[in-house]
């Protein structure tokens, strides 16, 4: 806990989010912008709000987020992971519910590297019999 802020770091793909929460009225600010301005897709907004709605804290915390790296979906996932960790820092009794929903576990899937001699990570050149 930093002052009256609770902190959580979230990661997803190559995105990293630093999340600070404190008691408030439900404002979420991402990189200095309101969340609805920062994330253009409705699914991204839904992903970010999932841990708050699960724990019935959607209107009880003001959230400040610094997120960098990755794309929109990766950043939304990183913010969700960071909010989850910050909520656990605030109240450890929320951990079982968040864990059962799968929000505590860091999604370890990363982009597979491209291999030499292939078009992509696994896509080979088209094979011709003749």
UniProtKB/Swiss-Prot annotation:
<dbReference type="InterPro" id="IPR020574">
    <property type="entry name" value="Ribosomal_uS9_CS"/>
</dbReference>
<protein>
    <recommendedName>
        <fullName>Small ribosomal subunit protein uS9</fullName>
    </recommendedName>
</protein>
<dbReference type="InterPro" id="IPR014721">
    <property type="entry name" value="Ribsml_uS5_D2-typ_fold_subgr"/>
</dbReference>
<dbReference type="InterPro" id="IPR020568">
    <property type="entry name" value="Ribosomal_Su5_D2-typ_SF"/>
</dbReference>
<keyword id="KW-0687">Ribonucleoprotein</keyword>
<dbReference type="GO" id="GO:0003735">
    <property type="term" value="F:structural constituent of ribosome"/>
</dbReference>
<keyword id="KW-0689">Ribosomal protein</keyword>
<dbReference type="Pfam" id="PF00380">
    <property type="entry name" value="Ribosomal_S9"/>
</dbReference>
<comment type="similarity">
    <text>Belongs to the universal ribosomal protein uS9 family.</text>
</comment>
<dbReference type="GO" id="GO:0003723">
    <property type="term" value="F:RNA binding"/>
</dbReference>
<dbReference type="GO" id="GO:0006412">
    <property type="term" value="P:translation"/>
</dbReference>
<dbReference type="InterPro" id="IPR023035">
    <property type="entry name" value="Ribosomal_uS9_bac/plastid"/>
</dbReference>
<dbReference type="InterPro" id="IPR000754">
    <property type="entry name" value="Ribosomal_uS9"/>
</dbReference>
<dbReference type="GO" id="GO:0022627">
    <property type="term" value="C:cytosolic small ribosomal subunit"/>
</dbReference>
């Amino acid at each position: 806990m930093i002052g009256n802020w609770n902190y959580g770091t979230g990661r997803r793909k190559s995105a990293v989010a630093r999340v600070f929460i404190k008691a408030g009225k439900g404002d979420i600010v991402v990189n200095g912008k309101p969340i609805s301005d920062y994330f253009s897709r409705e699914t991204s907004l839904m992903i970010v709000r999932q841990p708050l709605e699960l724990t019935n804290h959607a209107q009880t915390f003001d959230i400040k987020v610094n997120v960098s790296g990755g794309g929109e979906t990766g950043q939304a996932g990183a913010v969700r992971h960071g909010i989850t960790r910050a909520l656990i820092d605030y109240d450890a009794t929320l951990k079982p519910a968040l864990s059962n929903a799968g929000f505590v576990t860091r999604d370890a899937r990363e982009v597979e590297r491209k291999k030499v001699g292939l078009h992509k990570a696994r896509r080979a050149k088209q094979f011709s019999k003749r």
